[in-house]
């Protein structure tokens, strides 16, 4: 009799889930089971901590928490998650910290509520609603099998950024080590701090002519890069922009050195030391 009752309850639960809206799913994934912690401040809830548990593979940031809108995903609140494969972002989130969802190596997609006026997702990638800024790329998106130079099995991915994007935000591709090919549209003007930090396999990158700014550590530890062409429109390159890009031996700059704002050791180095056969060509 007891087993029969349990079966009936389970069946009812399944039916309810099948026909329920997003609010019910939000309750299940962001409630006690997921143990998401929030901080309420000035009538708004901010995501403070997301649990790193093997039992939690999807996280939903709800529209509201305790009757107030959830408006912010704080820095480091949903970072370094080992098991999460997808994060859903509610309609009231208007601020996503640059460190908030970094180094989540198993995330295949982000999903943003279509009624969110600040952000959207395109094929699992977060952009601002106006499609001018790329916010976060999921590290495990569209992985395919491949072989590395030593014949070892690896997973790789390729991506084309949407046309019209002007800013690749800080840490947008942070530690996307499986990304081997990236197409950047002609519209991009800014690549911000640590945007491609440790994209270790990325090769044959073409920087657009319209690019004006390359941030600090933008390409640090991008071992796959071998040659970079920097257009005359670039006005500033931040410190350590190409730190530890040990295979990047050719840098062509279509400008004179005196015309640029150059951060400390902006050029390729080997753990901060000069690379002997590095060639930097100025106009």
Task: Please identify what each model-predicted range represents.
Residues 13-15, 21, 175, 198, ...:
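The N-terminal extracellular segments of secreted preproproteins, especially immediately downstream
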Residues 46-48:
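Non-globular, low-complexity intrinsically disordered regions
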């Amino acid at each position: 009799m007891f087993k029969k009752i349990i079966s009936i309850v389970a069946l009812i639960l399944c039916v309810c889930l099948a026909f329920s809206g997003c609010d019910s799913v939000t309750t299940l994934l962001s409630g006690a089971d997921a143990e998401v912690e929030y901080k309420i401040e000035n009538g708004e809830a901010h995501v403070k901590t997301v649990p790193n548990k093997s039992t939690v593979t999807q996280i939903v940031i709800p529209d509201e928490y305790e009757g107030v809108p959830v408006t912010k995903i704080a820095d480091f609140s949903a970072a370094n998650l080992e098991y999460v494969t997808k994060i859903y972002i509610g309609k009231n989130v208007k601020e996503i910290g640059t460190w908030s969802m970094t180094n989540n190596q198993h995330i295949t997609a982000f999903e943003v509520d279509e009624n969110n006026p600040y952000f959207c997702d395109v094929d699992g990638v977060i952009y601002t609603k106006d499609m001018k800024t790329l916010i976060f790329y999921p590290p495990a998106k569209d992985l395919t099998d491949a072989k590395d130079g030593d014949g070892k099995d690896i997973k790789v991915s390729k991506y084309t950024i949407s046309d019209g994007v002007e800013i690749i935000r800080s840490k947008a591709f942070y530690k996307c080590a499986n990304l081997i090919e990236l197409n950047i549209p002609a519209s991009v003007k800014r690549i911000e701090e640590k945007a491609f930090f440790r994209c270790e396999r990325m090769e044959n990158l073409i920087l657009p002519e319209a690019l004006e700014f390359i941030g600090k550590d933008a390409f640090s530890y991008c071992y796959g890069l071998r040659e970079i062409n920097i257009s005359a429109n670039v006005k500033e390159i931040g410190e350590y922009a190409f730190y530890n890009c040990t295979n990047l031996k050719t840098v062509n700059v279509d400008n004179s050195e005196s015309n640029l704002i150059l951060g400390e050791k902006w050029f390729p180095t080997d753990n901060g030391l000069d690379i002997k056969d590095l060639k930097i060509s100025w106009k």
